[in-house]
A protein has these predicted regions:
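Short beta-strand segments
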Residues: 7-41, 47, 55-59, 68-69
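Charged, gly/pro-rich active-site loop segments
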Residues: 64-122
Length: 122
């Protein structure tokens, strides 16, 4: 992997109300030290992020070149207000248009600011 941002997916961990972790793989793009994840608005990770903004990200779970970060998330409901991020998703994922709500319903953008790299880094 040339850079962690070139990975096809990242594992995001959010915290449930009882403090237990919820971990799932997601598509992502990055701008500087900010990672962006698009998700259906009704997903568990979104509910968790709205209640507790702490998250962790893990990239390349094979162990060959691991990257693990901690950060904070802001949930944006108006994804059309982020055309540059929408364009990055389309470029990285073969034209995938996250504005198209016909498959999963309305989507949100998770804006994740990296506070600290625990392993690796950009």
């Amino acid at each position: 992997m040339r850079s962690p941002v070139d990975a096809p997916c990242v594992w995001i961990t959010t915290l449930r109300a009882d403090g237990s972790p919820h971990t799932t793989p997601v598509w992502f793009v990055a701008t500087g030290d900010t990672f962006w994840v698009a998700s259906a608005a009704t997903n568990v990770k979104v509910r968790n992020a709205l209640a507790d903004d702490r998250v962790s990200l893990a990239i390349d779970g094979s162990g060959a070149d691991p990257h693990v970060a901690q950060g904070n998330v802001v949930v944006h409901h108006d994804i059309a207000g982020f055309p540059d991020v929408v364009s990055l998703f389309m470029q990285k994922y073969d034209g995938w248009n996250l504005l198209d709500a016909t498959v999963d319903g309305a989507r949100v953008l998770l804006e994740i600011s990296i506070e600290r790299w625990l392993l690796g880094g950009p």
